Structures are given as structure tokens and as C-alpha cells.
């Protein structure tokens, strides 16, 4: 069995790490380069760096911040935000990203996923799915930083991105995001059961127990969290120890 991964997330706006509730109400947390370096030392398995307003403001991800972050981080770094062309992917991989996260551009042009996978390999292509509940056991895909309802069924889209060559799905429950009430287990379970590629659970983590819970009750491969780590509520190692006690395999 593959070890489960713990992934701190750096949501970056104007070159600073921020954290908000339900995608709004953003608070400044600090410098992305310093924070990424701390998580690298703390035993994180990977880091996700999301330039959260890049797509909405129609500007490119801050490549220099990516370069500086990548120079301090020796674990896989996934970068997302404003990526809409193969050239964008190339630029970020060259800047030091190991993977790129596609969202709005992939929904607009699903063949972009295939194009990215063919050029750089599926292992480089993560598709981020921001999903919001519309009725019982039904979720829609949202784009543009969670501002626009596409009307696309999230389960159907997850299957499609896997078929198009994505190597991984970063699944965020917009209903849970920032609430610290725990991951959306129902959404996460349904999506991870419907695809054969790895799924990263995101949105709602408020404690180490929530991470234990998402691995115990769904087949996700990784858990992403921000505020519990940013605010020092628990460390990556504390989470991993809890997972070990629960019989869940992690890299210590």
C-alpha cells in the first residue's frame, strides 16, 4: 500500500500567503518562500502553491515567487493559478515546479489536459476540482477562484479528467473550505471511488483527527490542509503520528 501524503497548501495573493473562509475574507499569513521552507523541514510530503487570484485577474502565476520557493523546497511542489497554455506549464516546470494544477482553463478546454499530459507526462498534470453541493449527492464544478458555477457535474468531470490523462485530482469541497469542520467525506468518497488516479482531499480540515477520518473513510491518497499548519494548531509530524496510531501508512 502506498503511504498517504500530507500536503500543506499555500494560497498566495499578491505574493503573500493568505487564508480565508469559503474562498473570501482573506487574512495575511506570511511570506511563501519562508513558509514553504518551514514545511519542507517539518516533514511535509509535498507542497501545493496556489496563486488564488491569477485566473480571475487574468494574469500569470508569479514565476519569480515560484522560483524562490522551489529553491528552498526539496519535496514535490505543485503550482496552480492562471495556467492556460502549454507554454505556461513549461515556464512553471522550468521555474522549479514538479507538477502544475489546472482548473478554469481545463474546464474551458478539456483537451488542454491531454495536451499537457502528452507534452510533459501525466505525472506533471494535476486537475483541481472546486465542487459545491447543489442537491443531495450532486455537486457542480466551480471555476474562476470559486466564483462561477459551470453547471458541470463534479463526478462526471472527475471521470473525464482521468480519461484525458490527468495524473491526479485536487478535490476541494467549497462548502467545507475554511470552516474547519472536517473534509466533505461524502463528496470525497464518491469522487475517489469513481476514478483510478490519486485524489487529494481538500477543504475543511480543522484538526489532525479530520485527516485520520478522511483516510479511514475514503480511498483518497493525500490530504491537503492550510490553517491547522499555518496557525501552529498542529504539526505535520503530529498528524503523521496520529495516522500511524490509527494504522494508516505514512512516511515519517
From Swiss-Prot:
CC annotations in GO: cytoplasm
Single GO biological process annotation from the record: L-histidine biosynthetic process
Cited Gene3D superfamilies: Aldolase class I
Pathway participation: Amino-acid biosynthesis; L-histidine biosynthesis; L-histidine from 5-phospho-alpha-D-ribose 1-diphosphate: step 5/9
One GO MF term attached to the UniProt entry: lyase activity
Broad class of enzyme this protein falls into: lyase
Database matches in SUPFAM superfamilies: Ribulose-phoshate binding barrel
Record's keyword terms, sorted: Amino-acid biosynthesis, Cytoplasm, Histidine biosynthesis, Lyase
Location in the cell: Cytoplasm
Catalytic residue list: 11, 130
NCBIfam families referenced in this protein's UniProt entry, alphabetically: hisF
Name recorded for this polypeptide: Imidazole glycerol phosphate synthase subunit HisF
Amino acid at each position: 500500500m502506498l503511504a498517504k501524503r500530507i500536503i500543506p497548501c499555500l494560497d498566495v495573493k499578491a505574493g503573500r500567503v493568505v487564508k480565508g473562509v469559503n474562498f473570501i475574507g482573506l487574512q495575511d499569513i506570511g511570506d511563501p518562500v519562508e513558509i514553504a521552507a518551514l514545511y519542507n523541514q517539518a516533514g511535509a510530503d509535498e507542497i501545493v502553491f496556489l496563486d488564488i487570484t491569477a485566473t480571475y485577474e487574468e494574469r500569470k502565476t508569479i514565476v519569480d515567487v515560484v522560483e524562490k520557493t522551489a529553491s528552498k523546497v526539496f519535496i514535490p511542489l505543485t503550482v496552480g493559478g492562471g495556467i492556460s497554455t502549454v507554454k505556461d506549464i513549461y515556464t512553471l516546470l522550468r521555474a522549479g515546479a514538479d507538477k502544475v494544477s489546472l482548473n478554469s482553463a481545463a474546464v474551458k478546454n478539456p483537451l488542454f489536459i491531454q495536451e499537457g499530459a502528452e507534452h510533459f507526462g501525466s505525472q506533471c498534470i494535476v486537475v483541481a476540482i472546486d465542487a459545491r453541493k447543489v442537491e443531495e449527492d450532486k455537486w457542480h464544478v466551480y471555476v474562476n477562484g470559486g466564483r462561477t458555477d459551470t453547471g458541470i457535474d463534479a463526478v462526471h468531470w472527475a471521470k473525464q479528467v482521468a480519461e484525458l490523462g490527468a495524473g491526479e485530482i485536487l478535490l476541494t469541497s467549497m462548502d467545507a473550505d475554511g470552516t474547519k469542520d472536517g473534509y466533505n467525506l461524502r463528496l470525497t468518497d464518491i469522487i475517489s471511488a469513481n476514478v483510478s488516479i490519486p485524489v487529494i482531499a481538500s477543504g475543511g480540515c480543522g484538526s489532525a483527527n479530520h485527516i485520520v477520518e478522511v483516510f479511514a473513510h475514503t480511498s483518497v491518497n493525500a490530504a491537503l490542509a492550510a490553517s491547522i499548519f499555518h496557525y501552529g494548531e498542529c504539526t505535520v509530524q503530529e498528524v503523521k503520528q496520529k495516522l500511524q496510531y490509527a494504522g494508516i501508512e505514512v512516511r515519517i
